Amino acid sequence: MAKVNLIESPYSLLQLKGIGPKKIEVLQQLNIHTVEDLVLYLPTRYEDNTVIDLNQAEDQSNVTIEGQVYTAPVVAFFGRNKSKLTVHLMVNNIAVKCIFFNQPYLKKKIELNQTITVKGKWNRVKQEITGNRVFLNSQGTQTQENADVQLEPVYRIKEGIKQKQIRDQIRQALNDVTIHEWLTDELREKYKLETLDFTLNTLHHPKSKEDLLRARRTYAFTELFLFELRMQWLNRLEKSSDEAIEIDYDLDQVKSFIDRLPFELTEAQKSSVNEIFRDLKAPIRMHRLLQGDVGSGKTVVAAICMYALKTAGYQSALMVPTEILAEQHAESLIALFGDSMNVALLTGSVKGKKRKILLEQLENRTIDCLIGTHALIQDDVIFHNVGLVITDEQHRFGVNQRQLLREKGAMTNVLFMTATPIPRTLAISVFGEMDVSSIKQLPKGRKPIITTWAKHEQYDKVLMQMTSELKKGRQAYVICPLIESSEHLEDVQNVVALYESLQQYYGVSRVGLLHGKLSADEKDEVMQKFSNHEIDVLVSTTVVEVGVNVPNATFMMIYDADRFGLSTLHQLRGRVGRSDQQSYCVLIASPKTETGIERMTIMTQTTDGFELSERDLEMRGPGDFFGVKQSGLPDFLVANLVEDYRMLEVARDEAAELIQSGVFFENTYQHLRHFVEENLLHRSFD
């Protein structure tokens, strides 16, 4: 089937007035290849040309004023080809001096007693406006587009095309296209939405702020609705082929394993285990997200599930994003399982004969549980009968990587784990219909980490506090944002310089260095020394953000903490507080922005990762929270997942009803269904 368009035009781009081969090249750089693309190329913002009352105008604000010229314009030249034109206006009985730099031609256009409209920066003290645009009344020649356009669309453009040109070309296109409605009359009436025709025309040429708000609301809902139709349809297709073998685990053996654990499970852990076990008994494949705050005990839950698979005769796989984390998981699971399970580690560092033997053992089921990095998804990694695939910190992998691991078993159950609690909005968008288990309870005996914020000039006091902890036999992390100094970020501390400074302070043998440029063997050596308490202080970049577990570490200093988002800061902080000893986290930062100050304040107020994830999403937006490409989120033109989260839930419910009821597959939705199928359904946002 050919590509289905919801916007159809009788013309090609080349047939539009003002578009030739050179313009086509520029438009293609803007990803505009068809008339439909042009119509859907929406403004990034709007310039407000509404004339303002000067009595209400704030000093140094950008304003639009209208007044009568009462002195002839005067031009003064200075420097090399520079000029300054001065003219005086009477604006509602207020004498205003207008200055235009490097626009001497305006002298011939502005006449005495003429009414003109000026846009520029207002100086309240001097009663002066520095103009950047001027509109003349109907008696004069207009130097810009008509000032009657109160809201002027502004587009992202490139060299070779001007704002006026793209506005004119979009206006031409809108006059001739046929726009098929994306929403039914019933949906539009139910949620008081506009037609797509009105919406697109208004987004490009708004007549009022009220119209623009209505159009943006309609388009935002439409984007979210189409996205959710795609998600719900994919879920339907996935579940239709989601038969699974029932995992007939030995409950008595599992209970015995839990009883042998050196600690008692929290109620949240027990609840999560029960939810996962119910999924394993179900006739369809499990798709579950296990989310829990740092140190909440997700790995133990995963271990119990792996053990259950072993009792049923199946293998398990655990994929993590880094080698350090893979090694730590392997160590902790081997300690938990003892001789009851054969655990193996496969990373990029495992090569040659060792790798060959491991793969043979995996295929003949000598290995019960395989832990590794993306090396697990390589073609030569063949399981005998894998029944459970676990992906830790799953948002750090692309959708395709996760799918490849899942396909290692024909009827494999899938468990995703994350220590970055997912805000509800993103959970709906990224994980769709996936079931979610949450561990919001920390193990008994854990004390909340005391977090404080210090300015750079208080560094010596922080150092004294860290030294006090070291004297108690504890260990400490020191985190920096950069590996080496940068000429672009001269005021940001780098890990190498701080490492050398602390070596001088504490002695060379007591301080270790960890960063991403070290080889896997070098990282492993440093981490082993820190884990074995051969070094007291580990100076590191964010490579320790996830998973590193050293219970004796009770102090963390994060240098230039304002350079990190809330979720990253919280993950870093989670490296301490992993025992019954009191732990401390000190944020060293002198933020210059309100956002930076707010982040530091929030971090000192709460240690709740779920609350922090919501605040982080509000401050950074969904694109930065995961990274759009990593998360599978589309880049919406109008919709905002933070601001429009209620609308997202409504769109999701409506899409789910259409798909699940089967109404979407009736003739009424034929055009929209073909559009979603041909343009969205199998599109990857990775």
UniProtKB/Swiss-Prot annotation:
Tell me where in this chain the Helicase C-terminal domain is found: 462-618
Name the CDD domains for this protein.
DEXHc_RecG, RecG_wedge_OBF
Superkingdom classification of source: Bacteria
GO function terms (MF aspect):
ATP binding; ATP hydrolysis activity; DNA binding; DNA helicase activity
In this chain the Helicase ATP-binding domain maps to 279-439
The molecule here is called ATP-dependent DNA helicase RecG
Instruction: Report which reactions are catalysed by this protein.
Output: Couples ATP hydrolysis with the unwinding of duplex DNA by translocating in the 3'-5' direction; ATP + H2O = ADP + phosphate + H(+)
EC class of this enzyme? isomerase
* Binding, ATP: G292, D293, V294, G295, S296, G297, K298, T299
Motif DEAH box: where? 392-395
Q: Whom does it interact with, and what assembly results?
A: Monomer.
